[in-house]
């Protein structure tokens, strides 16, 4: 955020708010890891830091090492992030749970469905490029 505060963020810069689930980045069993847990309270903490920095860049969340995104706190975190104007980074590179093995498209559809549920439209490719200052 310091680059943004100094006006030196390149086009397309974003703020990625990382959350760490039960499986960390690649663990084969649940482990305690460093990082913010995937909760709405952690989201508010991150957003407070961003607000105090006075940096206004598009932001998104990514939940690393979590299982299904449509369960409990993970669902509420994604729903609240979308509702507050954030974006979601999803895909198999962040998903890890040895018992739950969705496809990449399944994870994308989960986020799409949450966005529709809160009334948030899905950006077209052109709209996304404009949003990130790449158009």
How would you label these PLM feature ranges?
Residues 96:
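Metallocofactor- and cofactor-centric catalytic cores in central/energy metabolism, strongly enriched
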Residues 121-134:
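Long, positively charged, glycine-interspersed low-complexity recognition regions
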Residues 99-122:
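C-terminal helical cap(s) of enzyme catalytic domains, especially alpha/beta-barrels
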Residues 1-91:
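Catalytic alpha/beta core domains of metabolic enzymes, predominantly
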Residues 2, 100-104, 135:
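Short secondary-structure transition/capping segments
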Residues 81, 111, 128:
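Conserved, mostly hydrophobic/aromatic
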